[in-house]
Amino acid sequence: MELDQANVPAEPRLQRLAAELIPRGVRGATLAAFTDGWTTLLGREPDAERMGEGGAILFALGAQLLGAADAMIETAGRLYRHQQVARRDLSTVHWPMDELHQLAGHRFAKRLRPLTALVALAARDSRRSPPEPEGTPGRAWTLIRHRLTGRI
């Protein structure tokens, strides 16, 4: 892929990503696939599967950069992505109940918890309608509980 050979298009964000991530072992093809999950939001009918894959790639990249692996990290990324899209009223094409059930009771390693804390909040929001505003005591407690236990 061109990104792997330092042929980065003149897009500042892409150049910054390539400069930071390719030296850390992230492949250019992964960066290119990452954008697909985000560009689907620009269409009239966003593709739920593509949105979810964008989250899966984001979390797989995050886990790689944190130096940890977990079989459920991509599922966690899908849940996070779908809930963030719904929280911002960008799309309601998918309600992440499958992902929520798959992650129920799963415990993430300490090294991944700064990343998976976002999933704990997404799971909390998925169980409530409408989701609470950011910064409430209940959401803060969710972050603390996840940091201590690693459970979703």
PLM region spans:
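Catalytic cores of Mg2+-dependent Asp-rich isoprenoid enzymes
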Residues: M1-T39, D47-I152
